[in-house]
Amino acid sequence: MTLLFAQTAWLVPLYPLVASLLSLLWSPGVISRTGPRPCGYINLLMGTLAFVHSAVALVALHSNSTAGSSAIYRPLTFGWTWLDTAGLRIGFDGLITEPALVAMTVITGLHVLVQIYSIAYLEMDWGWPRFFGSLSFFEAGLCALVLT
């Protein structure tokens, strides 16, 4: 079951990306009845999900690599082809390795801590959607950069 988390570790950058897109709903004029606070809590929830997914994937990949020595040298790969025509291939390829998952776990863990601190620090501020959307978009970019 936990190996499934390692095989789907490419989904980890999508959690903060979805959170940053959901933050747009709390932009001024779209949702004004609830105020900006739910935006921060949704970003914290999605960041925590990304952290848990990357931590479980790291544990699963580490226990899989210690099961056999040949598994260490075979990282999980994924790819997505956007355009493939006349010898031109434009796509997105990535490797899920143990160092990449360690870096992604550190990134998402620090992001959760920054989110908790920011919720307390920005208590009376109305700029939550812009701040938390930018923060989650930055985290999604860092996690995607680690995987490629």
Spans of model-derived segments:
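Transmembrane helix-loop-helix hairpins at membrane boundaries of multipass inner-membrane proteins
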Residues: 1-10, 14, 26-133
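Alpha-helical transmembrane segments of multipass membrane proteins
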Residues: 21-25, 116, 140-147
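Transmembrane helix interruption/hinge and helix-loop junction motifs
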Residues: 98-99, 146-148
